[in-house]
Amino acid sequence: MGAPKILISKTLLQKLYIKENLTPFKIGEKLGCSFKTIRNRLKEHNIPFKNPAYARMTYSKKDFDGSLAEKSYMIGFRIGDLNVYKKSPNSYTVVVRCHTTQKQQVEVIKSIFDKFGRVSISLNNGHFQVNCFMNNSFSFLLKKDDSTWKWIINSDDNTVFNFIAGYIDAEGNFILNQGRARFKIDSYDASILKWISEFLKQKGIHNKLRIIYKAGEKVPSQNPFPKDLWRLNINGMNELQIFLEKLIPFLRHKTRLSQAKESLMNILKRKK
């Protein structure tokens, strides 16, 4: 009489082999059976063997499982500040990259991606280089054109303001000018700023959108502007208060959040 067959559930095999990316040899060690037994159970459960690219991944990656609001924030922040690519079309890894001198920016990136994959941070001469290694469920970040964010236009306000918060965390500024709170954001992304401007007007938040430098213009010590540079301003006290109260809950960048709260306090004091 032969040895009893070792039974291993499909759910457990999928967890160890696919989710945790363990090799059949490692799974065998973990479960107290041979490499061959694990290969046989994979075949019996119709779990396909991984191709070499997938098998080479040496750290676990989790599928994106966040809300539309979180996805919207990621897209806004990505468009504003991140480089996202795959090393090859067949790669199982989406690389999210950023170069910055701001520690707060690094903290935002880590808070977004650390729970989904490996985040590598290096510091050289005051410059941070951040690389995040995600799986293909983050392919929605690869493109930077309008198709990436147009779905947000028809979303609820919570989702829209998360996108705006992500974009502002990357690009925006809240300042005090002559004792008065102001907001501005400068960007080449004309279609995004035009949409944000119209959305805010629909919410009763008057703003000003204009081109501050035309493509080809030069300023001292800079190369010519490659495209028209746009600026969106909110200067009115009441409008800026509404904007800040809606936006502050979604900001993640410590400096941006501090600036926003300081601006709101400035407005409330001036109204007394």
Cite the ranges covered by each PLM segment.
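Internal intein/HINT superfamily modules and their associated LAGLIDADG
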Residues: 2-272
